[in-house]
Amino acid sequence: MTMRPVVTYVTNRKRTPPGHDILGRRAVAARLAAMRGAAYKGDWDGREAYDAPPYFVPDDALEVGRAHRLGIATADDLFGGVVPHAFVATKAITHGLCRDDATAPEGWSREMATCVGDAVLRGYTAFSRDDALAAVRELLDGGEARIKRCDGIGGGGQEVVRDLDESARVLDPLDDEALAAGGIVVEENLGDVTTFSVGLVTIGGLALSYCGTQRTVRNGHGHEVYCGSTIDCVRGGFEALAAHALRDDVRRAVDLARRYDAAALASYPGVYASRRNYDVASGRGCDGTLRVGVLEQSWRPGGASGAEVLAIEA
């Protein structure tokens, strides 16, 4: 039987990702190829006649239409995920809308907020400037708010605001059309934060789940951004991970990630993924109380993927 070649796939060639992101994804693809006894063929080329349908390692979750055109029909066809709409791959789905008449894109699930419940922090997703300001007003009653671009990664594209003037400074430059399509998240701001990474990877019938903590560093703009994770892995799914967790904070992070995972898959049934990762924040609210909640999902290769593949090989 001809083994399926492994290829990397770039979703948007107009966007230039960081060099370490490209190199990291190629290294993951090469390891996956070796593990599968197949060849790594570099970036996918639509003009090439592959000996067998490729196994894809994309740089982002794929919309279902594009996935089908590439021959991706199940989670076994890629290291990553497939979504019914582009916004479903972002942190937009973490929160509900701030009011009943708020605007939302086609395919938006109002059930997600109900399903996920208190597994997330207090916050809202907005697809218009007016809705975003309404969300900010409500959250500022409880202290500071964090405004987050839905497509931001690694902690980028975020600003903490303390009043409406600061909020306007952040929101005014936003493009209305992009806001209507992609949205913006307004969320309570936490201090003294620890961020857990909880994930599940399935490759070739093998399942690996893990929980770890993230490390951050200040970038050139003075913002805290992701710079790596330390993870503990177990064979099996989230149930095995929950049984393995010894510390209370780890068990809680795993439980919240499982609830978010179930809510997302139930609310957006077109999602399938071989890599499902969830960031869970634990920190202090402005009133000093401990707050814990899932920040976002990642259904694409990420910063921990190199370790994930090595662990599943072990």
Positions of PLM-derived features:
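A short catalytic or substrate-binding loop motif that flags glycine-/basic-rich loops and adjacent residues
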Residues: D151-G152, N189-V193, G270-R275
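Active-site nucleotide/adenylate-binding loops and adjacent lid/helix of ATP-dependent enzymes
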Residues: T94-I184, T202-G205, V217, S229-A262
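Phosphate-binding site of ATP-dependent enzymes
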Residues: R169-G228, N277-V294, S298-G302
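Short, flexible beta-strand-to-coil junctions
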Residues: T11-R15, P58-V64, G152
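ATP-dependent carboxylate activation and anion-phosphoryl transfer catalytic cores
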Residues: L206, R252-A314
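Short, charged N-terminal beta->alpha structural module
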Residues: T2-Y40, W108-E111
